């Protein structure tokens, strides 16, 4: 049985893969996506994985913190201040 969190994350992955415009075979796999589906079968490479992680962080408001409770480089809080996607930030 699929729980709500799993379902939401699968939805995030589907949205990302579909927005990247996968081929016809990928579209068939995306339609049957489960927690057991390997991301490589969807054509997700390391950069695509980083995008999926970014999407999940944004959806759930995840923030990396250091031992002093400050936002660390790469955290959503830090990215909000830079105003750009982490791949585009300098």
UniProtKB/Swiss-Prot annotation:
Source taxon at top rank: Bacteria
The protein's name: Nodulation protein F
Keyword Phosphoprotein among UniProt keywords: yes
Origin species: Rhizobium meliloti (Ensifer meliloti)
Keyword Nucleus: no
Domain Carrier: 4-89
Record InterPro entries: ACP-like_sf (IPR036736), PP-bd_ACP (IPR009081), Ppantetheine_attach_site (IPR006162)
SUPFAM superfamilies in alphabetical order: ACP-like (SSF47336)
Gene designation per UniProt: nodF
